[in-house]
């Protein structure tokens, strides 16, 4: 079974400000092709975090890329927040896409395998696991809890044979 990749906001920001070879070039065509085939998604809440108007418009013009939030994700989100209360930082005053990102992966796995873990979902994030002194979990920590693979953008490109170094 081919993986289904879910992109985090920090990957979108990386594509905007990262290596100039990736900006507005063939990498976006590849992302679009992967989205058309159902292999790459950006959860709706995560896309809502993206602030660059021009790039955000590019994503919004491709509805096949956006993974709409639904009742199944809400159920996964409730489970996630209940099982991992340290994944929610109560001091944040804006909606955070981290929890919906992981709950979307849980939903895809549940639909594919009947369990939250060991399914086709792969979270793509540049976030690092939390440091011991930090009180809240990060995306990779929550993915670890549910045995959801969490990789960075370059690892995804390598897995798909796009990047060969």
Where are these regions (language model features)?
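Short, well-structured N-terminal submotif of metal-dependent ribonuclease cores
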Residues: 1-42, 49, 53-60
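Acidic, PIN/NYN-like endoribonuclease modules and their adjacent C-terminal/linker elements
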Residues: 2, 115-121, 128-165
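Short His-Asn-centered micro-motif
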Residues: 7-9, 43-45, 97, 124-129
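Short Gly/charged-rich anion-binding patches and loops
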Residues: 26, 54, 100, 137-141, ...
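Conserved beta-strand scaffold positions in the cores of enzyme catalytic domains, especially
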Residues: 40, 66-68, 150
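Short internal beta-strands
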Residues: 41-44, 143
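PIN-domain endoribonuclease scaffold, especially VapC-family toxins
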Residues: 44-95, 162
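Acidic, metal-associated active-site segment
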Residues: 93-123, 138-142
């Amino acid at each position: 079974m081919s993986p289904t990749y879910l992109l985090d906001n920090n990957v979108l920001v990386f594509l905007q400000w990262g290596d100039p070879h990736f900006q507005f070039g063939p990498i976006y065509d590849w992302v679009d092709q992967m989205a058309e085939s159902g292999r790459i998604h950006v959860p709706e809440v995560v896309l809502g975090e993206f602030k660059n108007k021009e790039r955000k418009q590019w994503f919004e013009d491709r509805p096949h890329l956006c993974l709409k939030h639904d009742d199944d994700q809400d159920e996964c989100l409730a489970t996630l927040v209940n099982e991992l209360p340290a994944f929610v930082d109560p001091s944040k005053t804006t909606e955070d896409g981290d929890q919906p990102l992981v709950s979307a992966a849980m939903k895809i796995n549940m639909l594919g395998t009947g369990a939250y873990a060991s399914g086709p979902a792969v979270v793509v994030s540049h976030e690092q696991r939390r440091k011991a002194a930090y009180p809240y979990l990060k995306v990779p920590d929550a993915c670890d809890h549910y045995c959801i693979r969490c990789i960075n953008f370059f690892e995804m490109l390598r897995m798909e044979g796009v990047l060969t170094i």
